[in-house]
Amino acid sequence: MSNKKILIVEDDADVRLGYKILLTAHHYDTFFAGDAIAAISEAIMHQPDLILLDLGLPAGDGFIVLERFRANMNLALIPVIVVSARDLKEDKERALKAGVKGFVKKPWNDAQLLALIKRFLGQRDPLVLDRMAGHWQ
């Protein structure tokens, strides 16, 4: 059985290292994008089973990245969990309305993050497909 693939969209090298240590210890394959532009190309290239997305990114914020994921037929169904230092109620509501599966505040709790990952890993969201069907026709 192959390992599940997780794309981490995060600009901070220390945080990326933290993800790598945590997730490889739990047998996940990790791929990284350090900005909004790389996020789309890495997602298309690797077709991850799940995406962890920071909101504060260079070259466009996480909401722009999320919109681009949802607008791409090959990426729209991949579950996304936001992991961000931005902890505003408005950000959480906007992210959940955009279809993210969860919102985790940095610094994250390993057990909480792993539980969310396990819960949503590989789970394609038919509601997103229904919402986007008109866009793709």
Language-model features, listed with the residues they occupy:
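Two-component/phosphorelay signaling modules centered on CheY-like receiver
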Residues: A13-F31
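Acidic catalytic/metal-coordinating carboxylates
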Residues: D35, D61-E67
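Active-site beta3 strand of CheY-like receiver
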Residues: H46-L52, L57
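The feature encodes the CheY-like receiver
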Residues: P58, A76, L88, P107
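Alpha4 helix (beta4-alpha4-beta5 surface) of REC/receiver domains from two-component response regulators
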Residues: I64, D87-K105, A115, R119, ...
